[in-house]
Amino acid sequence: MGQGPRSPHKVGRRFPAGGKRGRGAKGSGRPLPGRKRQPWPPPDGRSEPAPDSHPHLSPEALGYFRRALSALKEAPETGEERDLMVHNIMKEVETQALALSTNRTGSEMLQELLGFSPLKPLCRVWAALRSNLRTVACHRCGVHVLQSALLQLPRLLGSAAEEEEEEEEDGKDGPTETLEELVLGLAAEVCDDFLVYCGDTHGSFVVRTLLQVLGGTILESERARPRGSQSSEAQKTPAQECKPADFEVPETFLNRLQDLSSSFLKDIAVFITDKISSFCLQVALQVLHRKLPQFCAHLCNAVIGYLSTRGSSVDGSPLLLFLRDQTSSRLLEQVLLVLEPPRLQSLFEEHLQGQLQTLAAHPIANFPLQRLLDAVTTPELLSPVFEELSPVLEAVLAQGHPGVVIALVGACRRVGAYQAKVLQLLLEAFHCAEPSSRQVACVPLFATLMAYEVYYGLTEEEGAVPAEHQVAMAAARALGDVTVLGSLLLQHLLHFSTPGLVLRSLGALTGPQLLSLAQSPAGSHVLDAILTSPSVTRKLRRRVLQNLKGQYVALACSRHGSRVLDAIWSGAALRARKEIAAELGEQNQELIRDPFGHHVARNVALTTFLKRREAWEQQQGAVAKRRRALNSILED
């Protein structure tokens, strides 16, 4: 893939930005109609009951629950008064559970109330809805209530045994069924009409949440989803809290999970081809992969076996046809992510080998290919994959599918192979391999996903000798807009075993250019990679970051830059901290007035630095000693 004489389509290339990891983004190549994943069921759907098929919630009742919820939020977090208030409110909820669940405003309030509810009141509300489960589950508002009730299980299952003992002692006011029995009852109801619930616009959301609860794992997508009219505090949940969360469940839950999952096998064709039902199977694969891996493998084999015997393809396996289909390709993406390495290797050899370039060029099939690359963990699989894709990296970028290239680079990082080769191919694809003076410009090109000529506005005729890199020209140009995928590419490269070329390019950036990178929502993560990569030594890190001198105040007064500065500060030695504090101290008042800067000033203890330097140095020295001690413990 050398440069040689340049064909017209290579000169002055601007690579399409490509899609984000979610589909349907501009330039992603993934068609929009019918592909958008909705965080909540749509406001209308085929399952909506008739207007008069459920009780009406009066304005007076709505007003009561609104006032009750407001009072509950203002009440102390603990104490008998609060417990009594919750008990009384949930008693009223129990009498109007169905009306609340099927009212838009009422269902939002009920979702919040369920978050406050102890075990027994929630069970009574659930029992009140039991005779109308189908109505609630397939209602555009009721579905949220059932999801919220199910998502209380991680909180309540631990207290179930304790409250059951209290109930036996009290001998009154207890629910007729335990929480475990209610969940199993819902699972039995769903299992009896599995196709109906899975194929319903709203009911499928209940199935997906139920699968997670039965498996004792709440997936990231569920935890990150906003629920109703949550308070602002609830919506400020840190990102690190939105990862898959596991919790203990009874053995009966896992047994029922296996029963539900067996239902997929009975009508596998429906779950592969129907857009709504397919989402349920995708969630099942994720949960089973974590909790019942053998059954997950069995389900994956059923999907692959069905697809590989349907249709015909003149250019290879019938599976290739389904990789190009909007619905089945999504399911196959999930299959690729959960397959064990030996099965993934055999799937590649039997169905995909020799077809990767075609898949990379396809507007839909390139996404399953990205998932295949994300799943590569062995040199045995990476070797043939790299051999197929390496000759066409520039063409794939030009087609607007940079996600394929980034996924391949990520596989090289993960496996620890072909790193030097893929970097050389990237330099050639972005037209900065030759002359060698251009290589120092690779970071802005990778970050913006632009070829050299486009980024610097050059016009080169076909067959012309590429011009040498002009340092003055590069220094005068402001850093272009950093793309998300460009940032991911640089993060992968910085975690390569030898990231020297990328670090030299970063070191060649001027202070304002490096500042722009740190202030960018996507680019700030490149600085994170510099600070955290085990391949970047302290000396190399300091050489890059020294260009930020003179930019610390602007960095501190930026949303993303302030976070980068905090990270730099955390790892800085005492001498570097003095330099940072001295520069910030010159603009102390500006920092204090800035919404981001005043947090940095507090973190740096800037007032102490300016007024009591000796005390500040003692404090920072003690912090440095504790950090060194902790690092030595962690290294041991």
Swiss-Prot record:
GO biological process: endonucleolytic cleavage in 5'-ETS of tricistronic rRNA transcript (SSU-rRNA, 5.8S rRNA, LSU-rRNA); endonucleolytic cleavage in ITS1 to separate SSU-rRNA from 5.8S rRNA and LSU-rRNA from tricistronic rRNA transcript (SSU-rRNA, 5.8S rRNA, LSU-rRNA); endonucleolytic cleavage to generate mature 5'-end of SSU-rRNA from (SSU-rRNA, 5.8S rRNA, LSU-rRNA); ribosomal small subunit export from nucleus
Annotated Pumilio repeat ranges: 92-123, 189-223, 313-348, 351-386, 509-544, 547-581
Region (Disordered): 1-59, 222-241
Keywords on record: Phosphoprotein, Repeat, RNA-binding
SMART domains membership: Pumilio (SM00025)
Cysteine pairings via disulfide bonds: none
Residues recorded with modification Phosphoserine: 7
Annotated Polar residues bias: 228-238
Domain of life, source organism: Eukaryota
Listed result of changing residue 626 to Q: In a breast cancer sample; somatic mutation
One family name in Pfam for this protein: PUF_NOP9
Ranges annotated as biased composition (Basic and acidic residues): 45-57
Coiled coil: none
GO molecular function: RNA binding
Keyword Phosphoprotein recorded: yes
GO cellular component: 90S preribosome; nucleolus; preribosome, small subunit precursor
Similarity comment: Belongs to the NOP9 family.
The name this protein goes by in its record: Nucleolar protein 9
Native species: Homo sapiens
Lineage, broadest ranks: Eukaryota, Metazoa, Chordata, Craniata, Vertebrata
Gene name of the encoded protein: NOP9
